[in-house]
């Protein structure tokens, strides 16, 4: 059988028995039942508590930061891989102003493009015919091998030009694009300036006309007759030279009266 007092001591919290043996209850460590009146003990215990709190805080925060860093790194790696795979797929991006040449179809495409250009140039300028005539005059002509050699030489020259002058062509295209953009901006700015000048000149002319109308014509007392104020009426002269207004119904009778008045009177014998 176990001692009941020992069981009671194990069940009770630490420092329970020592709590009543200390005079100042406010300066007692309730966890360990120690007197806290000495400043050394207080400082040591406060430092321990701070260290424990800091360690707890760091242990709870650091894993979250590490998880965030891992997630962001994974996202960056995924985006980089996606970009590289996409660039390999379509192979049309320009890193640092240079054309990517990793495509397996580069040389076949260059050869086909060169053949098309050679035949187009030969059809337009008849290079093969001209060179054949020149070779025939110098007695080095063959109906089969000379045209083949001419086309092969032209093809090689075209390939070399496409390979070595591609960088200059891209640079020229970039420069022309920049020049066109700058010219477009200049033309747009000039158009805006011309439109602003036109609006300003129109406003000045309108203001000048309004000032002339208000200050000169009205101040001198002139009366402006508008087209609506003019009414057209049928007027006929009378026998004594006066004018009078007549309606359309009395025009015929007035003419008859005028004719009767102008007729000579018969002379009585």
From Swiss-Prot:
Which keywords are on file for this protein? Answer: Membrane, Transmembrane, Transmembrane helix, Vacuole
The keyword Isomerase appears for this protein: no
Q: What membrane topology does the UniProt entry give?
A: Multi-pass membrane protein
Q: Does the keyword section mention Transmembrane?
A: yes
Looking at the UniProt entry, the stretches that span the membrane are: 107-127, 144-164, 177-197, 201-221
Q: To which species is this protein native?
A: Schizosaccharomyces pombe (strain 972 / ATCC 24843)
| Protein name according to UniProt | UPF0494 membrane protein C1348.01
- Subcellular localization: Vacuole membrane
């Amino acid at each position: 059988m176990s001692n009941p007092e020992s069981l009671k001591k194990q069940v009770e919290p630490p420092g329970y028995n020592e709590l009543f043996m200390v005079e100042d209850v406010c300066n007692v460590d309730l966890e360990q039942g120690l007197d806290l009146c000495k400043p050394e003990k207080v400082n040591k215990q406060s430092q321990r508590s701070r260290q424990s709190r800091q360690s707890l805080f760091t242990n709870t925060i650091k894993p979250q930061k590490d998880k965030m860093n891992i997630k962001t790194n994974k996202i960056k790696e995924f985006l980089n891989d996606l970009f590289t795979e996409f660039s390999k797929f379509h192979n049309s991006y320009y890193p640092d102003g240079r054309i990517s040449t990793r495509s397996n179809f580069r040389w076949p495409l260059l050869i086909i493009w060169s053949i098309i250009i050679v035949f187009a140039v030969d059809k337009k300028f008849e290079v093969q015919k001209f060179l054949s005539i020149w070779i025939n005059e110098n007695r080095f002509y063959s109906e089969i091998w000379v045209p083949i050699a001419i086309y092969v030489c032209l093809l090689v020259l075209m390939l070399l030009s496409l390979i070595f002058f591609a960088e200059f062509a891209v640079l020229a295209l970039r420069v022309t694009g920049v020049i066109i953009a700058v010219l477009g901006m200049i033309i747009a700015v000039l158009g805006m300036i011309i439109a602003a000048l036109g609006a300003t000149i129109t406003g000045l002319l309108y203001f000048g006309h309004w000032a002339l109308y208000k200050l000169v014509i009205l101040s001198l007392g002139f009366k402006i007759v508008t087209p609506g104020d003019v009414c057209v009426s049928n007027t006929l002269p009378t026998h004594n030279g006066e004018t009078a207004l007549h309606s359309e119904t009395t025009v015929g009778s007035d003419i008859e009266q005028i004719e009767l008045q102008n007729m000579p009177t018969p002379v009585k014998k």
